[in-house]
């Protein structure tokens, strides 16, 4: 879910995900679209492309476990 993604961003970067990336560049956030212009935007773009390919679930809402 977006909640787990936000937790990962906070753990990895120490940044508030909504404030730091909610409307970042052309691909991060709800309305993001267009060609990525740098690495962070590319990450958001790849993440959104991955979400679009999933079927049988709602990756923005379904919860999951993770570790690293």
UniProtKB/Swiss-Prot annotation:
Keywords annotated in UniProt: Disulfide bond, Myotoxin, Secreted, Toxin
UniProt GO MF annotations: calcium ion binding; calcium-dependent phospholipase A2 activity; phospholipid binding; toxin activity
Disulphide connectivity of cysteines: 28-44
Pfam families: Phospholip_A2_1 (PF00068)
Subcellular location: Secreted
Keyword Transport included in the entry's annotation: no
PANTHER family with a match to the protein in the record: PHOSPHOLIPASE A2 FAMILY MEMBER (PTHR11716), PHOSPHOLIPASE A2, MEMBRANE ASSOCIATED (PTHR11716:SF9)
Protein name per UniProt: Basic phospholipase A2 homolog BdipTx-I
